[in-house]
Amino acid sequence: RMAMRIVYVNESLAKQKAEEAVNSEIGVMTVSTDGAYHKVVDHNPWERFMPNWGDARISADLVCYMNGYSDPRREVYYDKSTFATKGAYKGTEDYVGLRRGIRQGQYNSWSQGYSCMKVTVSDNMLIFPASEVTFLRAEGALRGWNMGGTAKALYEEAVSLSFDER
């Protein structure tokens, strides 16, 4: 991650550090179980406020993008909207995000219909996923760096990994 953050300031150092990380004896995260998680002791806070408090929902920006591409990760990441079953918006997508910046008073009565993140009480909280590392490796490979695979193969691997992470 650090290498991609400095690539526009010092590309040669970025390349050096990325290649050192990928090719070191320890290596980098490559499978979803390698991801950095915060262990939940009592109750996952996302589960507490996302579906129950009514004031936090999935962003419409992200959901519209994913709907537009029929992104199959939607069913892994989100619960379906209940608007269609309530008859609120006939013909809407199964996944409906809440528009950013809307005033709380404007959506209180409808907030329960928007899609929520799929999360349970005991889910650990993902901090740094292996899929992100693999996407970064794909970006490095696209720049011609030695990332242990082609940009295409690493990108596809990252997408695949992202299905196991949430």
Per-range role (PLM):
Residues K15-R137, L142-R143, G148-R166:
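Hydrophobic-face positions in mid-chain alpha helices that act as interaction patches
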